[in-house]
Structure formats: structure tokens, C-alpha cells
Amino acid sequence: FFNYGVGTNEDSNISSTVLIDLKGNELSLYKYKGTQFIDNIEEVATTFTELKEVMYNRYKEMQINGDKLYKGKPIYVVIDEVGTIGTYHDKKIRDAIFNDMIELFQKGRACKIIFLIFAQKCDSTNIPSNVLTNIQSRILMKTDSEFNTNSMIGTKEQIQNITHIDVANFNKGRAITKDGITSETSLIQVPYVSENEHRNIVRHLGHSLKN
């Protein structure tokens, strides 16, 4: 809400937001100005193609101005349960999306196309390994999966250098972050908001951002 200001393009700190939820039940709450909600995979493929074109245009602008980092507003792409893409039956569409994701991950950050992806399990079962390796910064929340812990942050011994609390016993809002550039890890505590309170915030503050 803060980044969107009062809902006008001039007041917002964000160019636009793309919310992808192929299960279609959670991110559909946020149908605001400058926000595109997607719940079908064909539209995901189309949107990623369009985002690549935006990325190329931003790079051209950066080259003309001699900038290493795009000076305009960022575009955020939020994908809930990214592994759902890997279960889609059409291999051609599925592979095209993952290939576009790799290119956008590799090149998009400098021109402020930022991806935030969420998954219950981070392995190559539903997400190709070459996609996973191009995810730079990572966040590990409460989990009893040793595989998730290893793939996101590191071994149990490495975790113990960060915190003495077992990841499986983390409080709500507790997480370990890993910086994609420096590989530095940090233990953080995010304020926890209950589902009911969250829905109240969406209802009371979201009216000024509605389309």
C-alpha cells in the first residue's frame, strides 16, 4: 500500500505489478490500479514475452543514457506456487515460460524487473534446475524439509552459524535471507499479521487503489 501511494501513477513508487496465481484463490484479492492478475498459463506465457520486450527497451534507454541501473520505476512480478507451472501438460508452453524466466532472472534486475516467487518445495521435480540456479536472493521460512533448507541456504552446520534455533521450530515471521550478490545470510523477524487482520487492511486501505 505504501509503495502504491494514493493509487495514482505519479504518486506510486511502482510502475506496475504482475500477480500470477494459477490456483487463482489468494492473489486475486489484489486487483488494483497498475496491477495485472493472471490465473491461466497461456496468459503467463504472453506476459513474459511482453516483459522481455519491456526489458529490451529499458536496456536501450540505459545504453543511450550511459546508465548501469534503470532510473525509472520497477515492475514487480509475484508468482505464488511457481511449481504449478511445471505440472502443465503442454511442454512447449511450459518450456517457453521457463526459458523466458531464466532470461528475465539473468537480465531483468538491472532494468528493475523484479521477480518474487514462492514455492512449498524448491527442487527440480516441478522447476527445472537451470531456473533454480538463476534465482539469486533467497528466503527460507519455517520448514521441516532438510532438502529445502539445503537448497535455499545451506547445510545444517551452516544454519547453526546463523541461528541456534532449528528451522522447523521458527516462529511465524522468522526467516533466513541469503543475498544473491554477496551470499551474505541474515536472520530476520517479519511482523506477523493474522489472516483476518490482513483482510481488514486489504478492505479498508485498498479502496483507493481499486481499478
Walk through the language-model features, giving the residues of each.
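P-loop NTPase catalytic phosphate-binding loop
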Residues: 1-63, 71, 75-76, 83-147, ...
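C-terminal boundary and immediately downstream tail of ABC-type ATPase nucleotide-binding domains
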Residues: 163-167
